[in-house]
Amino acid sequence: MTTNPAGKSIVLGDPAPWFGAPLIGDGTFNLQVAAGRWIVLSFLGSPADPRADQELSNLLRDTQLFDEDKIIFCGIFTAPPQDATPYVAMSTPAISFLADYNGAISRSFGAAAMPRTVVLDPMLRAVADIAWDNAAGHAETVHNVLRSLPAVDDSAGVPLTAPALIVPRVFDFELCDFLTQVYDKIGGKDSGFLFDRDGNTSTLVDYRLKRRSDLSILVPEVRETIRGQIVRRLVPAIERFFQFSATRMDRYIVACYDSAIGGHFHRHRDNVNVGAQHRRFAVTINLNNDYDGCDLVFPEF
């Protein structure tokens, strides 16, 4: 996690401080999960301030600037609105409103004394910091910056490669076939995704965010076979390339993304939630050699 001394403006080029905040309405926004798009963080102060309403109207005058996969907008308030209904109505996958009622997020971006808009690149580094008192006009300057941004895939000027390790032949073919046959015979259940509420992590099924069926492997002998091949064939590669000694496995599952029902998993990080912060590496091993599904994408890269 990055930090920024309270009250100091963020330095352009530096990584932005990570944060999580409740959405006005329902749900939670985690900055670290939102990577992979240009992100507009507009610190608006109190919604009771008439200028906050005017600046917001000006910023959202051209909503076509914002797109869930390209540029997203977050309006951040330091006090609750008298009526949240208008903000809920304006909310879309590309436009959201965040509750920063203790002011901690605003302070970490230097927005406590002077409201401002900060633009982040897909790797969550600051590329623009436009205060309300900008001589060229706050909203107009923000719009000019957004119109000048390249496509997400061209944000670095050169192709980027995710720090993902690909290791062939981790499982024997016999183990792959066995696990596939067990799944075909028993089937899986909706796996859902982890969701934090009131400091607790629970599982929520929402087909817009994820659709996958999982079968937990519970037989000790099978788990030991899986673990043995991973420890001998994958763990040394992780230690060699990432200088990290993996000592535990979180769970043993056979997962299926079925194209017939639109299997998918929306953007996420595996260790954001309270109940998953022990995770360090996600391991996916393809079991079937006729797999021709979608790609695994790392939005930041």
List each language-model region with its residue ranges:
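Short, internal strand/loop/helix patches
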Residues: 74, 88-114
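Short, charged/polar "capping" segments at the starts of alpha-helices
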Residues: 80-86
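A short, hydrophobic beta-strand/beta-hairpin element that forms part of a small beta-sheet core
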Residues: 19, 106, 114-132
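Fe(II)/2-oxoglutarate oxygenase catalytic core
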Residues: 122, 140-301
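Residue-level structural signal for beta-strand termini and adjacent loop
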Residues: 32-34, 111, 132
